[in-house]
Design a protein with these regions (language model features):
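Gram-negative (and chloroplast) outer-membrane scaffold detector with strong preference
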Residues: 50-146, 151-157, 161
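Gly/Ser/Thr-rich helix-start
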Residues: 149, 165-167, 188
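Membrane-embedded beta-strand positions in outer-membrane beta-barrel channels/transporters
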Residues: 32, 45, 88-90, 142-146, ...
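Extracytoplasmic electrostatic interaction patches
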Residues: 162-173, 178
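Outer-membrane beta-barrel "beta-signal"
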Residues: 178-190
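Short glycine/proline- and aromatic-enriched beta-strand/turn motifs that initiate or cap beta-hairpins
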Residues: 18-66, 71, 82, 92, ...
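Cleavable N-terminal export/targeting peptides
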Residues: 1-25
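Transmembrane beta-barrel outer-membrane domains
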Residues: 24-26, 37-41, 78-84, 134-142, ...
Length: 190
Protein backbone atom coordinates (compact mmCIF):
# COMPACT_ATOMS: atom_id res chain seq x y z
CA UNK A 1 0.00 0.00 0.00
CA UNK A 2 2.87 2.38 0.81
CA UNK A 3 4.42 1.77 -2.60
CA UNK A 4 1.13 2.55 -4.28
CA UNK A 5 0.75 5.79 -2.28
CA UNK A 6 4.32 6.90 -3.11
CA UNK A 7 3.75 6.11 -6.77
CA UNK A 8 0.52 8.13 -6.75
CA UNK A 9 2.25 11.14 -5.11
CA UNK A 10 5.12 11.06 -7.61
CA UNK A 11 2.68 10.90 -10.51
CA UNK A 12 0.65 13.85 -9.17
CA UNK A 13 3.81 16.01 -8.76
CA UNK A 14 4.89 15.09 -12.29
CA UNK A 15 1.50 15.98 -13.74
CA UNK A 16 1.50 19.36 -11.93
CA UNK A 17 4.96 20.13 -13.35
CA UNK A 18 3.72 19.20 -16.83
CA UNK A 19 0.73 21.54 -16.45
CA UNK A 20 3.08 24.44 -15.61
CA UNK A 21 5.31 23.60 -18.57
CA UNK A 22 2.30 23.46 -20.92
CA UNK A 23 0.91 26.77 -19.58
CA UNK A 24 4.24 28.51 -20.27
CA UNK A 25 4.61 26.91 -23.71
CA UNK A 26 1.11 28.08 -24.69
CA UNK A 27 2.18 31.71 -24.30
CA UNK A 28 4.06 32.69 -27.48
CA UNK A 29 5.07 36.35 -26.90
CA UNK A 30 7.34 38.11 -24.43
CA UNK A 31 8.42 41.70 -23.72
CA UNK A 32 11.54 42.42 -21.65
CA UNK A 33 13.31 45.41 -20.11
CA UNK A 34 17.04 45.38 -19.26
CA UNK A 35 17.53 46.57 -15.68
CA UNK A 36 21.33 46.13 -15.60
CA UNK A 37 22.01 48.35 -18.64
CA UNK A 38 19.81 51.10 -17.25
CA UNK A 39 21.64 51.13 -13.92
CA UNK A 40 25.21 50.76 -15.16
CA UNK A 41 25.25 52.76 -18.40
CA UNK A 42 21.99 54.77 -18.63
CA UNK A 43 20.98 52.66 -21.62
CA UNK A 44 17.33 51.87 -22.31
CA UNK A 45 17.06 48.35 -23.70
CA UNK A 46 13.75 46.78 -24.74
CA UNK A 47 13.21 43.33 -26.25
CA UNK A 48 10.38 41.43 -27.91
CA UNK A 49 10.60 37.66 -28.38
CA UNK A 50 8.27 35.34 -30.31
CA UNK A 51 8.39 31.61 -29.56
CA UNK A 52 7.92 29.85 -32.91
CA UNK A 53 8.82 26.27 -32.05
CA UNK A 54 9.38 23.91 -29.17
CA UNK A 55 12.96 25.07 -28.58
CA UNK A 56 13.28 27.99 -31.02
CA UNK A 57 12.43 31.70 -30.84
CA UNK A 58 13.17 34.92 -32.72
CA UNK A 59 13.15 38.48 -31.49
CA UNK A 60 14.28 42.07 -31.68
CA UNK A 61 16.24 44.05 -29.10
CA UNK A 62 16.57 47.85 -29.26
CA UNK A 63 19.01 49.97 -27.24
CA UNK A 64 19.19 53.74 -26.88
CA UNK A 65 21.97 55.33 -24.84
CA UNK A 66 22.41 58.81 -23.45
CA UNK A 67 25.01 58.25 -20.76
CA UNK A 68 26.38 61.49 -19.31
CA UNK A 69 29.63 59.77 -18.32
CA UNK A 70 30.25 58.37 -21.82
CA UNK A 71 29.37 61.71 -23.43
CA UNK A 72 31.71 63.54 -21.03
CA UNK A 73 34.54 61.06 -21.73
CA UNK A 74 33.89 61.53 -25.46
CA UNK A 75 33.97 65.34 -25.21
CA UNK A 76 37.13 65.29 -23.07
CA UNK A 77 38.97 63.07 -25.56
CA UNK A 78 39.12 59.85 -23.51
CA UNK A 79 37.24 57.93 -26.19
CA UNK A 80 36.89 58.44 -29.91
CA UNK A 81 33.40 56.93 -30.31
CA UNK A 82 30.26 56.67 -28.24
CA UNK A 83 27.43 54.26 -29.18
CA UNK A 84 23.96 55.83 -29.29
CA UNK A 85 21.65 53.11 -30.66
CA UNK A 86 21.45 49.42 -31.57
CA UNK A 87 18.82 47.29 -33.31
CA UNK A 88 19.52 43.61 -32.73
CA UNK A 89 17.41 40.94 -34.44
CA UNK A 90 18.18 37.50 -32.99
CA UNK A 91 17.38 33.80 -33.09
CA UNK A 92 17.55 31.59 -30.00
CA UNK A 93 17.76 27.89 -29.34
CA UNK A 94 16.84 26.49 -25.92
CA UNK A 95 19.53 24.12 -24.64
CA UNK A 96 17.48 22.64 -21.78
CA UNK A 97 14.28 20.58 -21.87
CA UNK A 98 12.42 22.57 -19.20
CA UNK A 99 10.24 25.48 -20.32
CA UNK A 100 10.29 27.22 -16.94
CA UNK A 101 14.10 27.33 -16.44
CA UNK A 102 16.55 26.86 -19.28
CA UNK A 103 19.86 27.81 -20.86
CA UNK A 104 19.89 29.18 -24.40
CA UNK A 105 22.27 30.05 -27.23
CA UNK A 106 21.65 33.06 -29.44
CA UNK A 107 22.90 34.37 -32.79
CA UNK A 108 22.32 38.06 -33.46
CA UNK A 109 22.92 40.83 -35.94
CA UNK A 110 23.36 44.42 -34.80
CA UNK A 111 22.71 47.60 -36.74
CA UNK A 112 24.38 50.17 -34.51
CA UNK A 113 25.49 53.77 -34.61
CA UNK A 114 26.68 56.74 -32.64
CA UNK A 115 29.15 59.61 -32.56
CA UNK A 116 32.76 59.52 -33.76
CA UNK A 117 35.54 62.03 -33.16
CA UNK A 118 38.99 62.30 -34.70
CA UNK A 119 41.83 64.81 -34.71
CA UNK A 120 42.66 65.96 -38.23
CA UNK A 121 45.30 68.25 -39.73
CA UNK A 122 44.05 71.13 -41.86
CA UNK A 123 45.81 73.89 -43.80
CA UNK A 124 44.36 77.41 -43.95
CA UNK A 125 44.56 79.92 -46.83
CA UNK A 126 48.01 81.14 -45.67
CA UNK A 127 49.43 77.57 -45.82
CA UNK A 128 49.52 77.38 -42.03
CA UNK A 129 48.78 73.90 -40.72
CA UNK A 130 46.72 73.33 -37.60
CA UNK A 131 44.94 70.46 -35.86
CA UNK A 132 41.27 70.36 -35.03
CA UNK A 133 38.71 67.88 -33.82
CA UNK A 134 36.14 66.66 -36.33
CA UNK A 135 32.94 65.09 -35.00
CA UNK A 136 30.79 62.86 -37.19
CA UNK A 137 28.26 60.04 -36.98
CA UNK A 138 28.89 56.37 -37.69
CA UNK A 139 26.72 53.35 -38.45
CA UNK A 140 27.83 49.75 -38.66
CA UNK A 141 26.59 46.17 -38.78
CA UNK A 142 27.84 43.43 -36.44
CA UNK A 143 27.33 39.68 -36.13
CA UNK A 144 27.69 37.85 -32.83
CA UNK A 145 26.55 35.22 -30.39
CA UNK A 146 25.29 35.06 -26.82
CA UNK A 147 24.61 32.57 -24.06
CA UNK A 148 22.02 33.03 -21.37
CA UNK A 149 19.76 31.61 -18.70
CA UNK A 150 16.04 32.29 -18.35
CA UNK A 151 13.55 31.39 -15.63
CA UNK A 152 9.85 32.07 -15.16
CA UNK A 153 7.90 32.90 -12.03
CA UNK A 154 4.11 32.44 -11.89
CA UNK A 155 4.24 31.27 -15.54
CA UNK A 156 4.40 34.89 -16.78
CA UNK A 157 7.25 36.85 -15.17
CA UNK A 158 10.62 36.23 -16.84
CA UNK A 159 14.08 36.80 -15.39
CA UNK A 160 16.90 36.48 -17.91
CA UNK A 161 20.67 36.82 -17.74
CA UNK A 162 22.55 37.13 -21.04
CA UNK A 163 26.21 37.56 -22.04
CA UNK A 164 27.38 37.86 -25.63
CA UNK A 165 29.69 39.65 -28.03
CA UNK A 166 29.69 40.58 -31.69
CA UNK A 167 32.15 42.12 -34.13
CA UNK A 168 31.44 45.19 -36.27
CA UNK A 169 32.04 44.44 -39.94
CA UNK A 170 31.63 47.45 -42.23
CA UNK A 171 32.77 50.79 -40.75
CA UNK A 172 35.60 49.62 -38.52
CA UNK A 173 37.69 52.80 -38.65
CA UNK A 174 34.94 54.74 -36.82
CA UNK A 175 32.83 52.21 -34.92
CA UNK A 176 33.80 50.16 -31.85
CA UNK A 177 35.46 46.84 -32.70
CA UNK A 178 33.24 44.81 -30.35
CA UNK A 179 29.53 45.02 -29.57
CA UNK A 180 28.54 43.53 -26.21
CA UNK A 181 25.19 42.09 -25.17
CA UNK A 182 25.20 41.84 -21.40
CA UNK A 183 21.99 42.17 -19.49
CA UNK A 184 19.72 41.25 -16.62
CA UNK A 185 16.23 41.41 -18.10
CA UNK A 186 12.80 41.39 -16.51
CA UNK A 187 9.95 40.41 -18.77
CA UNK A 188 6.32 39.43 -19.17
CA UNK A 189 5.22 36.44 -21.24
CA UNK A 190 1.74 36.37 -22.74
Amino acid sequence: MKKLLILFLLFSFYSQAQEKENAIAAKKNEFRFDVLSLITSSKISLSYERFVGKDFSVGLNTNFSSSNKLNKDFDNGYRNNVPKFEFNPYARLALSKSKSRYYFAELFGSYNGGDFKEIIRLVDNNNVAYYTTLKSKYTDFALGGSLGYKMYFNQKIALEFIVGFGKNLTNREKSPDVISRVGLNLGYRF
